[in-house]
Amino acid sequence: MDLKKQYIIALDEGTSSCRSIVFDHNLNQIAIAQNEFNTFFPNSGWVEQDPLEIWSAQLATMQSAKNKAQIKSHEVIAVGITNQRETIVLWNKENGLPVYNAIVWQDQRTAALCQKFNEDKLIQTKVKQKTGLPINPYFSATKIAWILKNVPLAKKLMEQKKLLFGTIDSWLIWKLTNGKMHVTDVSNASRTLLFDIVKMEWSKELCDLFEVPVSILPKVLSSNAYFGDIETNHWSSNAKGIVPIRAVLGDQQAALFGQLCTEPGMVKNTYGTGCFVLMNIGDKPTLSKHNLLTTVAWQLENHPPVYALEGSVFVAGAAIKWLRDALKIIYSEKESDFYAELAKENEQNLVFVPAFSGLGAPWWDASARGIILGIEASTKREHIVKASLESIAFQTNDLLNAMASDLGYKITSIKADGGIVKSNYLMQFQADIADVIVSIPKNKETTAVGVCFLAGLACGFWKDIHQLEKLTTLDKKFKSTMDPNIRKTKINSWHKAVERALKWKEID
């Protein structure tokens, strides 16, 4: 085959928008198309989206990207799909219509149900051992249970054996294949609270616990399996050639693969509104003693699964947005580096803990609230901006230390991606405070690149990881220049501030 005239399209379905990106054999980005879709908040803590709007938006970007690239469908060698995780859709398999809106991963409507389950420590332990996850509204199981209990049409279709469940990847695959394939991959299945990550299969015991019938669940495949062919009517009326779906990964796992964190101990951090830190831990699902998640990273066909430890920072870029929108002390996020550098001229020991809605791992305190300590009469806006950027690095450092403690070795480097890696001040401070090398790739679309790589390996577009390494180039690298004693002092100040932020709501 003439590789110069072959392409891979990555479908990247995110939480607020979806994109399609066309890549060539040299990983050049030939074309990109993006569409946003609506999010609804019908009640406090409820977050929903329209599955049909997601589908039409994603399909439109796929068609648009192909047309922008001026390529034919028969020149597309494969498609890969990456998606927002945990979000659920239930639909009628006879007409393809959803029975309810998609319940999004941030949705908290099942918090009381999760709390009830968590009161039983035996159940809590069993679920963690099987899934690597805590019982939390974030994950899919209790969302499914809510629809089955509260939507009469769902109950009726379930009794008639006409109901199907899927995370967003399953929903898109089912639509792209015109209902021929009801499947998911191991990375998405591992986020449902229904998948045994040791046995690598749906757990009948967990399905019974959460009252979810196994019959509505998709078949679980390896991450670079054959997920079916995209029907020609989704390209154009005169489309020729069969285009297979050859890779599926949850978005954070896709970023891990896109950063080529393919060896145990390799770490990536996606710096966005929040942060997602994932570490490849190899083929054994080590359970964290520091409340990190253990999840399936990916599984290649005829290979054992690869697992990851995952930790989240709730507020990262959101802290900078808060400075702009709420405090109005900066006009754009781009100004943050300028002010942070300005603050270095009059250094202060100012610490900001942005616990707007609690703190995640390793603290796990929903009652924690934001706090700024060390304010003096000479404190100016630049000191608060600097402390805000530094808070992102401090929180990431806490996660890296938790991962290192779980696995018994020091982390020496991380690969960074996401919107706020543009901040040179943040990246340098991250290297300094964690004493790591921070590497940033030239191609910032690491999520899409991850499924592109996986699809390309599956269909022979690329031979192996070594070939992929030659396609990835570094944009920037940051190394620590901080004195170890200064680092220790700064971390101690951070932890003192965190201690004061914990259990704040209980003071009322």
UniProtKB/Swiss-Prot annotation:
Pathway: Polyol metabolism; glycerol degradation via glycerol kinase pathway; sn-glycerol 3-phosphate from glycerol: step 1/1
Xref: CDD domains: FGGY_EcGK_like
Gene Ontology MF annotations: ATP binding; glycerol kinase activity
EC identifiers of the protein: 2.7.1.30
Functional description taken from the UniProt entry: Key enzyme in the regulation of glycerol uptake and metabolism. Catalyzes the phosphorylation of glycerol to yield sn-glycerol 3-phosphate.
Family: Belongs to the FGGY kinase family.
Protein name: Glycerol kinase
Organism: Mycoplasma genitalium (strain ATCC 33530 / DSM 19775 / NCTC 10195 / G37)
Gene label: glpK
